[in-house]
Amino acid sequence: MRLASHPFTRLLMVSALLALGACSILPEQEPSDVYRLPTAATISKAATPAPWSLRVAKPKSSETLDSPRIAVIPQGDVISSYKGARWSDPAPVLLRNRLTDAFYRDGRVQSISTDDSNLQADFELGGELQAFQSEYRGKAIEVVIRLDARLADDRQRIVASRRFEVHQPVADKQVSAVVAGFGQASDTLTAQVLQWTVDQAQRHYTAEPKNQ
């Protein structure tokens, strides 16, 4: 005796087969190693706190740099990224957070905020991130970070501007070595931007003091 085939049973079987087929044709997501931006430990300086406050803003950048991809220029004007690796945050956020942390560690500016909090401040450090990538020079490779920094007062008037550019050679082409190179280049650039910001803000604040 044959069992009658119920229409509902056939429908379930067809649905299951379709689901299995869909699963087989969907591409598997490629696993990625997520990297933080390395930093070297710094010692806070013993100095009189600055009488002014600072807001550190995320620098503007191109769509290519404003992503978690680790950018690389293998040749000419070709921009690519390392396969299976990415940053923990987009490059502009990484640099902003590195600068903010550097000011905290330095200790000379104690009233610090970021553009995420949107708090009022005497000065704002921002600008444009023009390069944050590794570049091949023949068989050699180096990390390049280029920041057009801009310091503005609380009326959004530009107080000072300057281009900072760092080239950090990388001995190994492995991603981990390249990431370490980004950390070294960021430390160098951060130290330069920090000192420049303190000098320019202090000079402007002394020339136009508030609450006096």
Q: What is each stretch, according to the model?
A:
Residues 59, 128-132, 165-167:
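Generic short beta-strand segments
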Residues 25-47, 101, 106-155, 172:
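Surface-exposed short loop/turn segments
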Residues 78-86, 155-195:
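Short secondary-structure boundary motifs at beta->alpha junctions and helix caps
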Residues 24-91, 200-212:
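A structural "domain/chain start" motif
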Residues 92, 96-100, 106, 183-186, ...:
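Extracytoplasmic/secreted envelope proteins and their assembly/folding machinery
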Residues 1-13:
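Bacterial N-terminal signal peptides that target proteins for export
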Residues 19-22:
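C-terminal motif of bacterial Sec signal peptides marking the signal peptidase cleavage site
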